[in-house]
């Protein structure tokens, strides 16, 4: 049961990190005017 809990925590953390990195990397793509001005 402890192993299952650890696995769930790892999976949740992985998805949260994936979402955060995807949001940060997708931010400039959503705001192209910032890139064009520079």
From Swiss-Prot:
The keyword Membrane applies. The chain crosses the membrane at residues 3-24. It is found in: Cellular thylakoid membrane. The modification N-formylmethionine is found at residue 1. Residues 25-38 are cytoplasmic. GO terms for cellular component: photosystem II reaction center; plasma membrane-derived thylakoid membrane. Coiled coil: none annotated. Keywords: Formylation, Membrane, Photosynthesis, Photosystem II, Reaction center, Thylakoid, Transmembrane, Transmembrane helix. One of its GO terms (biological process) is photosynthesis. It is a single-pass membrane protein. The keyword Endoplasmic reticulum does not apply. Pfam families: PsbI (PF02532). Disruption phenotype: Decreased yields of PSII dimers with increased PSII monomers, slightly slower photoautotrophic growth, about 20% less oxygen evolution. Formed PSII dimers are stable. It comes from the Bacteria. PSII binds multiple chlorophylls, carotenoids and specific lipids. Residues 1-2 are lumenal. InterPro entries: PSII_PsbI, PSII_PsbI_sf. Belongs to the PsbI family. One of the components of the core complex of photosystem II (PSII). May be required for formation of PSII dimers but not their subsequent stability. PSII is a light-driven water:plastoquinone oxidoreductase that uses light energy to abstract electrons from H(2)O, generating O(2) and a proton gradient subsequently used for ATP formation. It consists of a core antenna complex that captures photons, and an electron transfer chain that converts photonic excitation into a charge separation. PANTHER family: PHOTOSYSTEM II REACTION CENTER PROTEIN I. HAMAP family: PSII_PsbI (MF_01316). PSII is composed of 1 copy each of membrane proteins PsbA, PsbB, PsbC, PsbD, PsbE, PsbF, PsbH, PsbI, PsbJ, PsbK, PsbL, PsbM, PsbT, PsbX, PsbY, PsbZ, Psb30/Ycf12, peripheral proteins PsbO, CyanoQ (PsbQ), PsbU, PsbV and a large number of cofactors. It forms dimeric complexes. Part of a photosystem II (PSII) assembly intermediate complex PSII-I; crystallized from a strain deleted of psbJ, it forms monomeric PSII before addition of the oxygen evolving complex. PSII-I includes 3 assembly factors not found in mature PSII (Psb27, Psb28 and Psb34). This is Photosystem II reaction center protein I.
